[in-house]
Amino acid sequence: MPKSYSRRQFLQASGALAVGAAGAGSAFAGSALAKDAKGDWNAGEVVHLLPAANHERILLKASFRSGLKDAPQLLVAGRRIKGHRSDTHGRFWQFDVPGLKADTGYTLQLADGKGKALCSPWPLKTFPCPDASPDHVRLLVYTCAGGHPDARGPGGMEAFRSLAIRHALLERGLAYQPDAVIANGDHVYQDQRTWLESSNPAIRKAATDFYQQTGMFDTSQPVLGTDNERILATLVDPQIAHLYGTRLRSTPVFFMMDDHDYFENDEAEENFVTFPPDHFDLSLGRTVQDMYYPEFLPDATRSLMLPGSNASDRAPQVSECFGTLRYGKLLEVLMYDCGRYLSLKDKHAGIIPPEAEKWLLDRTRQSEARHLIHMPSTPFGWSAGKWREWYPDVVVSDETDMAPAGAISQRFWGVQGKNLHLSTQKGKYMWQPGWFAQHQRIVTAMTGQKRPAVMMSGDLHATGWDRMLRSGDVDLSKNPLYLILNGTLGTGKAGWPSAARGLAPSTPTLLQLERNVQPVEKNGFSIVDITPDKIVCRLFVWREPDPFEAISSLEPYEVIEIPIG
């Protein structure tokens, strides 16, 4: 396939090949196995495919309907790449393909150890070289896609959207044929202590009932090779493998991790502090990543010494927590996990470790990309009064304002009273002043750029945007920081901030935002178009009482244009 083809042209031209192979190959004779959403591609034995790509390498994560005794193969560019098993039973495999040409379309094919096709072939295209000058790239971005569809909140309330709703939202986003997908954290919701030890009896009962059906992890045993592995697949398959299936097989993905991906909510109480994650939670998070979705591929400007990078039990040189999406000289996206390496060192604390902060600051000041986007898993610009935020604000009511001063713990369903609002008049239990100090160093570097300062965040169950004009004593008015919440795919009724905490996401006390408009608590996603002269971000939202059928023709409710000059 010639390099001059765009990714969209390549996918269109490759479609006929995939359809023909599915119909003609004896491997699928009489098959009633799953096809993709449009019914024109035969998934065969494959349950899910999630590929990462840069300009020279592909890393593919895959799962199959049943365990494979012999290692499967990935056929690409005349090569046979032997799969590396990610689990005990041979259902999960990964394929690492280095040495590819930049900006080139490839046809991929999975086969078993004897060479028999396991699914139809499909196309995938590498990114342009870092020194290339592409004129356009399109991203599909969202957060909080996880959640077991059978889980329930207090009183049987819907906790997460059905897979049908999430599938419809994904299909609508993919209809725009993005060049890459960024899923910003919270791919899994299966909290342990924070559900089972909640101060709310209804949450404890809902969690207990659910875990009685699935089983509880034995924290004294390894994750793999014990019954923990069965429980893990039971809990996670619906949230990742069944959610994505093979929809993204031809679209490079970037999956960031956040708090729930370590099987806890970010909470601090007198009887427990959930982050940084303990050893077992960390093992759960790393195992899910290893089995289900790709790590970040290496980038020449990102040190292999960053925490969570170049581990001996991972593909060479990948990073588990800090990633780069580089699309020629047009775009650089810096993605960072704000959970795994959080520290509790008072004024010296950080939500990300010092090495990662240095990387962010260096790239912000030195990147030659036309556009630079920061993408943390914990948002700048708004607060829900949660513990692990950059800001010290807590949710209080008129009644708590009259209570004696002291530290307040902010838990799900934990704030009662009238006229709820954010306040810094009372301390937030275990909140670290070093977190905001780190925030200030990042916003200072971002506003100091000659290009627009842009940040797109995850975690917060809402959609919206604003511009930061001031942060504490940092004046950003000469180059305001664009803040965008890209939308939440899976949040159900129990998860909206106004339901869980009594207050919609609001502006922290220490910030001055230009619009000061509360984000919208609806499901959705963003389509982001980047050209040399501007970034255009289209925000899509949906929620009842709008009919389900409206998702298939959803149009943006807001369009943000960020010009380069």
Language-model segments: what does each one mean?
Residues 2-3, 9-31, 103:
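N-terminal export signals
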Residues 7-8, 439:
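Short, cationic motifs built from Arg/Lys/His that form the positively charged side of catalytic pockets
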Residues 4-5, 58:
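Short alpha-helical segments used as structural interaction elements across diverse proteins
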Residues 35-565:
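Metal-dependent phosphoester/phosphodiester hydrolase catalytic core
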